[in-house]
């Protein structure tokens, strides 16, 4: 991950209205019961149970993925049985992003990479170490966040840093880190028009 093509903007932009809007959009998307609060229970249900069950993960893959989701959102301060409102959620994201960027700068494993490894293992159906556009489309359909084929293809294009026509976990980690943590311009349109 030290290659120049995988370098990422390492400074946060927490006051950027677009960064805040991006996270507010996801907060609302992940608020399964629409009560204005979310909990780790909802995150695991949405990010793990629904998605992974729709992708045919093995029990081992499902457990690994669930553990990664728990650790990731736990890093943002979320807990089972505890509802988090928007102000606490965004503050948790700031802490998570700061911690993750420090790890990334030191070439240490990040929670987003650990989650990416777990998800990649499930999405990469032929286990060749790369995700094809068809595999990506199957995942985005199961996740429900990207609805249009155009947005799915745009996401794939943005993540395909080396322009190989396939995605590897390093590319995915780099682009998601830049999109969710720092507003890196190279990551714009990561979700097409599905996420601001």
From Swiss-Prot:
Ca(2+) 2 binds at residues 124, 126, 128, 135. GO terms for molecular function: calcium ion binding. Residues 47-57, 62-72, 107-117 are annotated as: May interact with the chromophore. Keywords: Calcium, Disulfide bond, Luminescence, Metal-binding, Photoprotein, Repeat. Residues 18-53, 54-108, 117-146, 147-182 form the EF-hand domain. Pfam families: EF-hand_5 (PF13202), EF-hand_7 (PF13499). Changing residue 129 to R: 51% activity loss. GO terms for biological process: bioluminescence. The record marks 196 as: Required for bioluminescence. InterPro entries: EF-hand-dom_pair (IPR011992), EF_Hand_1_Ca_BS (IPR018247), EF_hand_dom (IPR002048). Gene3D superfamilies: EF-hand. Residues 1-7 form a propeptide. The keyword Transferase does not apply. The reduction of the disulfide bond is necessary to regenerate aequorin from apoaequorin. Ca(2+) 3 binds at residues 160, 162, 164, 166, 171. Signal peptide: none annotated. Changing residue 152 to S: 33% activity loss. Ca(2+) 1 binds at residues 31, 33, 35, 37, 42. Ca(2+)-dependent bioluminescence photoprotein. Displays an emission peak at 470 nm (blue light). Trace amounts of calcium ion trigger the intramolecular oxidation of the chromophore, coelenterazine into coelenteramide and CO(2) with the concomitant emission of light. Belongs to the aequorin family. This is Aequorin-2.
């Amino acid at each position: 991950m030290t290659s120049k093509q995988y370098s990422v903007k390492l400074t946060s932009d927490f006051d950027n209205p677009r960064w805040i809007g991006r996270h507010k959009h996801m907060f609302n998307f992940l608020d399964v019961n629409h009560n204005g609060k979310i909990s780790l229970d909802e995150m695991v249900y949405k990010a793990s149970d629904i998605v992974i069950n729709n992708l045919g993960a093995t029990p081992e893959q499902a457990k690994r993925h669930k553990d990664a989701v728990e650790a990731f959102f736990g890093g943002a301060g979320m807990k089972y049985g505890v509802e988090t409102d928007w102000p606490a959620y965004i503050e948790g994201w700031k802490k998570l992003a700061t911690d993750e960027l420090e790890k990334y700068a030191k070439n240490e494993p990040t929670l987003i990479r650990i989650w990416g490894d777990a998800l990649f293992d499930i999405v990469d159906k032929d286990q060749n170490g790369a995700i094809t556009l068809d595999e990506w489309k199957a995942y985005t359909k199961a996740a429900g966040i990207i609805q249009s084929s155009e947005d799915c293809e745009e996401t794939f294009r943005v993540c395909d840093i080396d322009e190989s026509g396939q995605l590897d976990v390093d590319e995915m980690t780099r682009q998601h880190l830049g999109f969710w943590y720092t507003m890196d311009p190279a990551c714009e349109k990561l979700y097409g028009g599905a996420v601001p």
